[in-house]
């Protein structure tokens, strides 16, 4: 990797972002894909499992407490305020995962769901802080690289709580699996506590009574409605697929062991590779060109599901299908998240990033919650055809995105 343009301190900051992103990915999957396997073994049907995606509706609302986080993080405590927010939030996430293991989803349904909601709440705050840290610690010319690092850390977390958790579930109970995942977050917590944070610019806390300042600043940007619409629809394909590939692979005969290695582990490596490639492509190509290309590649990857369904279901075909899907997914994410940072002003980075990612999560959560219905009533072949066509609205919007955005 070419780090000639990256200052020495920036390298450590990028590595810091990579490591603290790990718990974000690990916890995220514990309320999503990995949870679906636990629920499947607890004999919940596909429709109910799909509706569990609504637990993550809290991610849509996170922009509401963005101004409060900015007030706390950029207070007179300076960098320490931001660090305190990271530490307290991650501790609460770890505690919530442990508490979740006290409940059985069949016999303690209500407290189980409530605990998931609280976990999603703290996880959404942690997600906001991680993403804003890139604007605070990294120069804008290196956002593509820092986003690749963030994606890599996030994906490694997903790998552990996906493939690792799935494999462990064949040996120990799901409750013990979740306890193990919570323990794995502790090293990142220790790093946050002891790492010397130093913002590239001095940050000043915004007055909390000026709650709408961040939103007003955003709508002054050129074509802001197009930007918001694009954020909502860019991940429509992934939102529509949601956690249904898990059910698809099981339905066509693959075992949990096959999926732990072939889908979760290999797929995550492919996604990380795609994310790194996408991050460095951000330094070479302008955003509109790159976003269009990677969107098309990812749309074509839906053909791999249809290939598996109709033609071949051996282990090699699984690896090919998973690589096509996950590599292109990773390829789309680095330029997309880097573009999100480009759309934000540094003074309001936490609130505006929360706003943009909340908009993105509207599609991910609401569309994802009906994926079970779609898969049930369309059948797998038509379901994946529709998923492949989901790129069209975002592709059209890319043509109308503003050429330049003031992100100061």
Curated annotation (Swiss-Prot):
Keyword Transmembrane: yes
Tree of life domain: Bacteria
Keywords linked to the UniProt accession: Cell inner membrane, Cell membrane, Membrane, Transmembrane, Transmembrane helix, Transport
CDD domains: MFS_AmpG_like (cd17486)
Localization, UniProt: Cell inner membrane
A GO CC term attached to the entry: plasma membrane
Membrane-spanning parts: 11-31, 49-69, 84-104, 110-130, 154-174, 177-197, 224-244, 261-281, 294-311, 315-337, 353-373, 382-402
Annotated membrane topology: Multi-pass membrane protein
Pfam families in the record: MFS_1 (PF07690)
GO terms of molecular function: transmembrane transporter activity
PANTHER family: MAJOR FACILITATOR SUPERFAMILY DOMAIN-CONTAINING PROTEIN 3, SOLUTE CARRIER FAMILY 33 ACETYL-COA TRANSPORTER -RELATED
Entry's family note: Belongs to the major facilitator superfamily.
Protein name per UniProt: Putative transporter AmpG 2
Protein encoded by which gene: ampG2
């Amino acid at each position: 990797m070419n780090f000639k343009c990256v200052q020495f301190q920036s390298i450590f900051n990028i590595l810091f972002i990579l490591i603290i992103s790990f718990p974000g990915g690990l916890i995220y999957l514990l309320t999503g894909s990995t949870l679906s396997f636990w629920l499947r073994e607890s004999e919940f049907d596909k429709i109910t499992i799909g509706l569990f995606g609504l637990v993550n509706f809290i991610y849509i609302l996170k922009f509401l407490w963005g101004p409060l986080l900015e007030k706390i993080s950029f207070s007179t405590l300076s960098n320490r305020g931001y660090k305190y927010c990271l530490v307290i939030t991650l501790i609460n996430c770890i505690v919530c995962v442990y508490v979740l293991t006290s409940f059985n989803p069949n016999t303690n349904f209500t407290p189980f769901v409530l605990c998931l909601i609280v976990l999603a709440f703290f996880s959404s705050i942690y997600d906001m802080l991680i993403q804003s840290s890139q604007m605070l610690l990294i120069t804008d010319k290196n956002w593509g690289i820092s986003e690749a690092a963030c994606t890599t850390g996030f994906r490694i977390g997903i790998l552990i709580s996906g493939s690792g958790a799935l494999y462990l579930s064949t040996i120990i109970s799901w409750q013990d699996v979740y306890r193990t995942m919570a323990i794995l977050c502790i090293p990142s917590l220790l790093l946050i506590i002891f790492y010397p944070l130093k913002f590239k610019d001095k940050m000043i806390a915004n007055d909390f009574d000026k709650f709408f300042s961040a939103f007003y600043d955003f709508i002054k940007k050129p074509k802001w409605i197009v930007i918001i619409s694009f954020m909502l629809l860019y991940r429509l394909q992934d939102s529509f697929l949601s956690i249904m590939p898990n059910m698809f692979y099981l339905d066509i005969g693959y075992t949990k062991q096959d999926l732990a290695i072939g889908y979760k582990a290999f797929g995550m490596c492919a996604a990380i590779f795609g994310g790194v490639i996408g991050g460095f492509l951000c330094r070479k190509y302008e955003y509109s060109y790159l976003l269009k290309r990677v969107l098309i590649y990812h749309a074509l990857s839906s053909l791999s599901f249809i290939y598996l369904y109709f033609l071949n279901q051996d282990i090699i075909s699984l690896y090919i299908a998973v690589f096509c899907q996950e590599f292109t997914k990773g390829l789309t994410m680095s330029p997309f998240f880097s573009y999100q940072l480009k759309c934000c002003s540094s003074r309001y980075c936490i609130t505006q990033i929360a706003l943009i990612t909340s908009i993105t999560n509207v599609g991910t959560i609401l569309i994802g919650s009906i994926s079970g219905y779609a898969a049930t009533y369309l059948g797998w072949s038509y379901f994946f055809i529709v998923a492949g066509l989901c790129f069209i609205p975002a592709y059209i919007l890319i043509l109308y995105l503003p050429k330049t955005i003031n992100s100061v």
